[in-house]
Amino acid sequence: MKDKLIVFDTTLRDGEQSPGASMTREEKVRIAKALERMRVDVIEAGFPVASQGDFEAVQAVARSVRESTVCGLARALGADIDRAGEALAEAESARIHTFIATSPIHMKRKLRMEPDQVLEHAVKAVKRAREYTDDVEFSPEDAGRSEIEFLCRILEAVIAAGARTVNIPDTVGYNLPEQFAQLIRTLRERVSNSDKAIFSVHCHNDLGMAVANSLAAVMSGARQVECTINGLGERAGNAALEEVVMAVRTRQDSFPCDTNVDISQIVPTSRLVSGITGFSVQPNKAIVGANAFAHASGIHQDGVLKERQTYEIMSAEDVGWHANQMILGKHSGRNAFRARLRELGIELETEEELNAAFQRFKELADKKHVIYDEDLQALVTDANLAAENERFKLSWLKVVSETGETAIASVTLSVDSIERQASAPGSGPVDAAYKAIDSILQSNTELLLYSVNSITSGTDAQGEVTVRLKKNGRIANGQGADTDIVMASAKAYVNALNKILYPVERAYPQV
């Protein structure tokens, strides 16, 4: 029987460190529930000591998730660990993940500690975490640049203190696959009590090696991989969950282990994370990119038509891709709508959410004669993009634009439940709409990114707009979808403004 490879998802913690990817409490819970449906083993929900908002988000995930272990991150400090323990108190299965830096440069320049002091802090942290849960994980930050002798000493000490999992992070993505594999082999051989703990890896993608390093470590005995949906993460990102899982599943001839992940949930969860964070998935992204299973070459197309396995090493349907087919129309009922959402891996938690989504579906069906799966996913995502405690809502928009003339936009916004109106000229319909919104909110933000993607084909297709705003060093993403591209643009802008003008303050550490 093959070993189990534990999948530890840190989209809600490390993934959220991507500039502009901040999530509200409700959005975190929605993603956590999707990860639970995917049968992810461990969900790292956040860093509870960072802020009251993050504490409440971890607490909400702990209350909502029953099948997966919920994890909270904590530095090797008593206050951090206590806060994590409090946030996880109602979890069905809880883990505290504590860490301290072990590389010479970090110990000297950042911690200003001697190695023996670092070891002492690590042991105390693990023992304190064990007061809250038996499931404790320890990470030596920047392990990839740490001295092997000290790394062995500290791992041996924390395992003896009660750590069930020891995680080896390549914090700055510096290692190459064979180097990282050798590091894991060496640690497992030289740490005398290594058989008492699961070895885990957490790889960053600065050199494009995160997935390769993770898989090399698995081949060397690691039995937990820390990763994120779509590879989301700070700088160049983290190891992509979908790539790690499908590499192990597809190459069972080479790997001595497998995961419990329900791979049919990969694409729906990828789209959910993309919609909530505003980070689009590149078309050529493995597994979840729009072109991942597209064949342009005539020879390839001919081969696939004759036998799919000639050029496809996995099935698109297996990972959650569905044919671009007409499925519903304006005469479709509520039960058919609910059933199709479930087939797409979309679960609405309450009847109120279902009713609201169904109403939006009916409105869309009046505009479009053909409704595709992609339309439904965009519709549900768009319905859930509202920021927590949303203060601004787009009530009405009218734009007049003629050839050779300046566009004029008139906007009505609900600001703290009070309707406010404004009009403004612009160099085009979108510019005019944004200026009208700005004249109401006086936002003084900088537009860093504006992009439009067609959700489906056809002249009546929905457009999905992504914007990225910057204000006082903060960055926020927003998304909106509509058959009217100007309306989609205004929705995305208001969505981003809700996030950037009233953000949740966080101060995450990096592991």
UniProtKB/Swiss-Prot annotation:
Q: What is its EC number?
A: 2.3.3.13
GO CC list: cytosol
Residues annotated as domain Pyruvate carboxyltransferase: 5-267
PROSITE patterns named in the record: AIPM_HOMOCIT_SYNTH_1, AIPM_HOMOCIT_SYNTH_2, PYR_CT
Reactions mediated catalytically: 3-methyl-2-oxobutanoate + acetyl-CoA + H2O = (2S)-2-isopropylmalate + CoA + H(+)
Cofactor(s) required, per the database record: Mn(2+)
**Which InterPro entries would you find in this protein's record?**
2-IPM_HCS-like, 2-isopropylmalate_synth_dimer, AIPM/Hcit_synth_CS, Aldolase_TIM, LeuA/HCS_post-cat, LeuA_allosteric_dom_sf, LeuA_bact_synth, PYR_CT
Tell me which Gene Ontology terms the entry assigns under biological process: L-leucine biosynthetic process
* Functional pathway: Amino-acid biosynthesis; L-leucine biosynthesis; L-leucine from 3-methyl-2-oxobutanoate: step 1/4
Q: Which keywords appear in this protein's UniProt record, sorted alphabetically?
A: Amino-acid biosynthesis, Branched-chain amino acid biosynthesis, Cytoplasm, Leucine biosynthesis, Manganese, Metal-binding, Transferase
Q: Which top-rank group of organisms is this from?
A: Bacteria
Which segments carry the region annotation Regulatory domain?
A: 393-511
CDD domains per the UniProt record, alphabetical: DRE_TIM_IPMS
Annotated Mn(2+) binding lies at D14, H202, H204, N238
- Catalytic EC class: transferase
Coiled-coil region: none
Q: Name one Pfam family in it.
A: LeuA_dimer
The entry's function note states: Catalyzes the condensation of the acetyl group of acetyl-CoA with 3-methyl-2-oxobutanoate (2-ketoisovalerate) to form 3-carboxy-3-hydroxy-4-methylpentanoate (2-isopropylmalate).
The UniProt similarity line reads: Belongs to the alpha-IPM synthase/homocitrate synthase family. LeuA type 1 subfamily.
This protein's assembly is summarised as: Homodimer.
What is the protein's name according to its record? Answer: 2-isopropylmalate synthase
> Which species does this protein come from?
Nitrosococcus oceani (strain ATCC 19707 / BCRC 17464 / JCM 30415 / NCIMB 11848 / C-107)
Q: What is the lineage of its organism?
A: Bacteria, Pseudomonadati, Pseudomonadota, Gammaproteobacteria, Chromatiales
